[in-house]
Design a protein with these regions (language model features):
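Active-site neighborhoods and metal-handling regions in enzymes and metal-associated proteins
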Residues: 1-397
Length: 397
């Protein structure tokens, strides 16, 4: 279904002087169309290196020109079944299945030209001489160069700022998916914690988390499992999941990111396994207080940079310095999205934004351990809705 207000998209694009957005990254295509070919990633090779997976969405500033989608020919059945809101559907290439080729035994079939199909759509819609916004960060030069060759009179600009501006404000359907994702994510986290046993490795618990995602109807995006302190120096980063064995007196940190219908729950907790030291207990209390204090500032009208400054001021008397360069961040189809609660992001919080809070400290005793509690919130008209409240913030659960 359509996950944004077209009038708002028009306003954003016209303010930036954009006539049409050409989205090519997986997350932007999926956002604008609510469609992505399930088995495919951005670089999936179909039958040779000239035929890699590519799906494109064109979003004209004027809705009467009609949005369009360009997909590989072998996706036609999938598109019909998934039936996204975009009805102008075009296909490139002969498709993956040889029974559809002119000569099924051709050893060198034409791979097709996705940019030619895209350019033809733009010409038909009277946009060939307009300002075309492409995802410069993600669209390779081979593709972008081909599109510019086919449309020599067009002006090409970057689409990234316009797409992010559109994605920051969530629609009712996105919010519904977030609520379900966070409900599932909270349960998956708690069930994973209750599955922890002495002698387990981080990889063992990671496998439990993956399994629980499937059992609870969520997709596994990623999760960090960290046991510690474990004698590690984390001055420039946290350890990847590995073979540290869980012992009594350790913390378990799970930073989980399951998703539901494309939308992510970003939830992190630190819990004690067995009785932890007094200093670890105190660090947990401080971290919990930091999150709860920052929650008081999450409301429409607050600048992201103001919330970050308030967080930084809290460190003056707690005995720990800040660890990460922001207080929290936006979430959507990607776990880290604008706006960031950072000193250089002056975005004003608005209703229907989804943000996290994750002030983080580093406890050093027997090795470094990042102490992090992360929660996800919906900005409402008068405050916040705590989407991950079902996951206890307690030291022991």
């Amino acid at each position: 279904m359509q996950l944004f207000e077209y009038d708002r998209a028009t306003h954003i694009m016209e303010a930036a002087g954009i006539d049409v957005i050409i989205a090519t990254s997986q997350k932007s295509v999926a956002y604008l169309s609510d469609y992505w070919h399930p088995p495919s990633d951005q670089f999936y090779v179909l039958w040779d290196t000239e035929a890699t997976h590519m799906t494109i969405v064109g979003l004209p500033a004027q809705c009467e020109r009609d949005a369009f989608i360009v997909a590989g020919a072998s996706e036609s059945t999938t598109l019909e079944i998934m039936d996204p809101w975009i009805q102008d559907r075009r296909y490139w290439g002969p498709g993956y299945y040889i029974q559809t080729w002119d000569n099924p035994l051709d050893p060198n079939p034409p791979s097709g030209d996705v940019m030619e199909v895209t350019a033809n759509a733009l010409k038909e819609k009277g946009l060939a001489n307009g300002t075309i916004a492409i995802e410069m960060r993600y669209l390779g030069s081979k593709y972008s160069g081909r599109l510019q060759e086919l449309l020599p009179n067009a002006t090409f600009v970057d689409a990234e700022d316009a797409i992010w501006a559109l994605r920051m404000i969530k629609c009712d359907e996105e919010i519904r998916r977030f609520r379900i994702a966070c409900e599932k994510g909270s349960k998956i986290w708690l069930d994973t914690i209750h599955s922890a046993e002495e002698g387990m490795t981080q990889s063992d618990l990671q496998a439990v988390y993956r399994r629980l995602c499937i059992e609870n109807g969520a997709e596994y995006e990623r999760a960090y499992m960290i046991f510690g302190p474990a004698g590690l120096d984390l001055s420039n980063g946290s350890p990847a999941s590995g073979e540290v064995e869980l012992e009594k007196g350790m913390f378990i940190r799970i930073d989980g990111q399951p998703k539901y219908q494309g939308y992510i729950c970003n939830l992190s907790r630190i819990v004690g396994f067995g009785e932890v030291s007094d200093s670890l207990t105190k660090a947990h209390e401080i971290e919990k207080w930091l999150v709860e204090r920052c929650m008081e500032e999450m409301k429409p009208g607050m600048k992201c940079s103001e919330i970050r400054q308030i967080e930084l001021d809290l460190y003056d008397d707690i005995g720990y310095p800040p660890v990460i360069p922001y207080t929290g961040h936006g979430v959507g189809r990607v776990v880290h999205e604008p706006p960031y609660l950072s000193l250089n992001d002056h975005t004003v919080l608005q209703p229907n934004m989804v943000e996290t809070l994750e002030p983080t400290i580093c406890h050093s005793e027997g090795g470094d351990m990042f102490i992090s509690i992360e929660d996800q919130f919906l900005i409402t008209n008068d405050g916040i809705e705590w989407l991950t409240e079902a996951a206890p913030m307690d030291l022991y659960v």
